Amino acid sequence: MNLNPINPKPKPALWLWWLAAIFFVGASVCLGWYLYIQANRPGHDTPLDALAAPVFNPLPLGSVMPKGWLLEQLKLQSSGLTGHLDEFWPDVKDSGWIGGKAEGWERAPYWLDGMVPMAYLTDDAKLKAKAKHWVDYILKHQTADGWLGPERGNPAYGLIGKAPPNAVRDPWPQFIILKVLSQYEEATGDPRIIPAMEKSMRSIDLQLDQRPLFNWNFFRWGDLVVSVYWLYDRTHEPWLLELAAKAANQGYNWTSHFWDLPLKHKSERWNWVGHGVNNAMGLKVPALLYRLTGDARYKKLAWRAIEQLDRYHGEPNGLMSADECLAGLNPSQGTELCVIVEMMFSLENSLAVTGDVRFADRLEKVAYNALPAACTPDYWRHQYVEQSNQVASAYVEQPIYATVSGIANIFGLEPQYGCCTANMHQGWPKLTSHLWMESPEGGLAAVVYAPCVVDTQVQGDAVHIEEVTNYPFSESLTFNVTTARPATFPLYFRVPEWTQGATLKLPDGTIESLKPGEFHEVSRQWNGTETLLLQLPMPFKLRKGYQDSVSVERGPLVFSLGLKPKWFDFMPFKFQPAGPRKFDWAAMPQTPWNYALALNTNDPNQSLTVTQRPLKGNPFDPGNEPIQVTVEGRRLDSWQSSEGAAAPPPQSPVESMETLEKLELSPYGSTRLRITAFPVLK
């Protein structure tokens, strides 16, 4: 008898039973997970008979007007490139859209998409005259079949790649100009606009039957659908829903894209799917598809899209890295300025449709940090790409970017490409017009906070609201609500996820505690002028990032170590404009940047101290910050530059024997050279 058989007969059966059991359980789990995913993943885009209602509706352009520091930003921008680009930059001054010989594709529509709302939000007579001149010309030259603008744009821009051989008309610029016209109609009530938009969409509808979407318009179809919905909400023409569904079914499948992001690492070459602006524009698509189909799973997908980009390409400033294509988690990778403004517009759309506070929180983070940091304080120069860890703004022969050149982060008129020169203008104006929205049951919602005034009709009654605040540089907001006669309606106040202990003092003196991550409703009768006081405490939070580095957040603001720059003129290689500012600026740091922070990561409020000053002038002008944060840190000599940028932060925690120093952190938006993602000391 073999007491120690090598292959005893009873045991294989036992192991096989165990193996079968494991396989069965595993298969059941996998099948269950697959069925769960399929049940929660949005399906085909079958349109409803009418659009599903959004949670909020944006107010018409001009209903919300900027005040305080926000008005200062719009005035600075209108005195800068926004108000003058058409006077000297050939691609707008001599645009094919007004009969010129220059580019007749996306650049003039991009500029108008920001200039038109800027004109009416600043009540600038000169800009309003420019807006009218452009709109008059475009409408006068609409073709008999409805096409707006040049029928053949610039083939070097519009028809690259595998365009159909008969692709004479590129609908992508049409998508932009339709957004321009809808804003113009809201501001002026011009009766020509709605018929012109309807004719344009009929023309696009016919073209999509003959030439399906391709290239840029294949990825950016969501911007057409935004205008289709705008028109449908006013005309209720059923064919518009069919056009929206046609675009969704012909265009890129953003549903699958954002369900499981196909590009999880830095792009090593340019590609359509990873293009940052395409992704920023695509973020609005899930919300748009919810309205088209009524499928609530699209609402969930809208935030999942943000989570996917955060997971693989998220940056401390609230953006995705994209220079030009998705570039991973390294905070020295850049993000294109077009991504900033287009992501803001997508967040505004997703916020309106879903009513999800998180979209507003992210919108403020991008707007109050990344947007102002990408431009000089006078808005005459901008960067093509911006870095969270930006230790230089100068030409680099072999840059860290994979898909743009070594001049991409200088501050100039047209660094790298001119698309951002044309498209940067929409950020502040569209944010302003989306600060307040109306609720379907006849109320008003404060969805994003900034100093402003609101004048609108609520259930037939004129309502005036004055929002007095220095937010995001202050925790206090005062709302003076005025009605001409007694009127009963609800107001909704957003309570950000990041706040703790928020309160709202009502006109009768009652103080209500607020729950983070929700809209707080105050439904009552309003009479005369009544005041509410909102307090949003801003505790410090640490965002963990690449290599366990951290960035410091307080409310919507991100704080950076601002580096003292040495500026010098930098003439572009090929383009030397003859406009008011004919040179670009480059900068090198004059102060050390390679610090690791001494932080209590369990309670950062123990390690960080706030200093506040009166807000005067431009809060995003370096040296004029109304708030700073003090923290201690040590130099980290092993952390040096690489490829013209800060090397990736060393894996935290780190050790340093250098002297412990006090460091002053400034709001990200007031810095032009900076470190934002820091290693943490042991």
Describe each model-derived feature in a short phrase.
Residues 221, 225-260, 270-327, 339-356:
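Active-site neighborhood of glycoside hydrolase catalytic domains
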Residues 97-101, 119-258:
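Extended ligand-binding groove/face enriched in aromatic
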